[in-house]
Amino acid sequence: MSKMIRQKTDRSDCEVIANFCLQNDLRYWEPKSQTSKELHEINCRLDSLKMELNRLNNQLEKSYLNEKVKKSINEEMDFIKNQIKTLEIEAQQIVVQNKKLQRNFEIITSIQGVGSKLALAILADADFERFQNGRQYAAFVGVTPSHFQSGTSVKRKSQISRIGSSNLRKILYMNALVVKNRNVDFADFVERLQEKGKAPKVIIVAIMRKLMNIIYGMLKNNQKFDKSLAFGC
């Protein structure tokens, strides 16, 4: 919270900082490990490559392109696909060589419908140890509701916050679709949302949020998926 300060001295600055620390539950900042940095860098590069691949694919769909241009685009896309495959293998090797990452990878993928791509993206960009609860974890990924209201007349429809890694969120979305259609452990959860009249897309976002909450709890407790713990039944 900001304060009205009439003077600025080293002493007053120290008092403000000290009061802030006393009034807030702060955690020590810890730098990422070298392994985490490497995974993060690979994931960022993968994100860029996939965006470029999508751009080229959109360009390829234009009907007026001549054959030489199409050939050039296809060759570039093949090159990018090989780069993506190489980096994904490199990321997997980093995980296999680190016992903690390997264990966390196994924990995340113990949920039916959650694949290796999502697990790698989470390990690279969403370190659970930085957060105090599952809601914070889900908020970091950008799948918690965002509300906007000004006065009594301006009120927008709630939507997800979309902060965090867009690539992670895209992979999470695809995994949520698989979980909805194939994971029987989520059937009751989905059915309750449907009975409330929730739209299909809202249900998918709810599954995304639920997955991040469950994954946080699993990683925090070093435990693979257990339906009774995940859904409290």
Model-predicted segments: where are they?
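Low-complexity, acidic/Ser/Thr- and charged residue-rich accessory regions of DNA metabolism proteins
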Residues: 152-156, 189-233
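Short helix-capping/linker segments at secondary-structure and domain boundaries
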Residues: 24-28, 127-131, 178-185, 213-227
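Short, solvent-exposed helix-loop connector elements
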Residues: 2, 30-40, 62, 156-159, ...
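Amphipathic, charged-and-aliphatic alpha-helical interface segments
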Residues: 82-95, 99, 116-129, 170-176
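Long, charge-rich intrinsically disordered scaffolds of nucleic-acid metabolism proteins
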Residues: 1-107
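Helix-hairpin-helix
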Residues: 104-126, 137
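Phosphate-backbone recognition surface of nucleic-acid-processing proteins
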Residues: 121-196, 200
